[in-house]
């Protein structure tokens, strides 16, 4: 007689949840990389690093930091809205390039 270990049983729902988690991880990593790469144009280490300059006493850095905070918020709002639409079956899963093309663009202050 074979015993069934219920902890090892994977349902279709379990597989779907796991696939969605992997998809979210993949797409959110791509969005994060996209933002980090953009700010390296001006020698910032990452979007997080640039955002810390929003409270700088140097006007140039403060403007760039605040612009980055606003852009980051817009990007994540749009990115998570797209993921919610995918989860809800309202749209197909975008490729990374498709996702990135739908995100707001960053414009450096004074550019």
Language-model features: locations:
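A preference for well-ordered globular domain cores
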Residues: 1-111
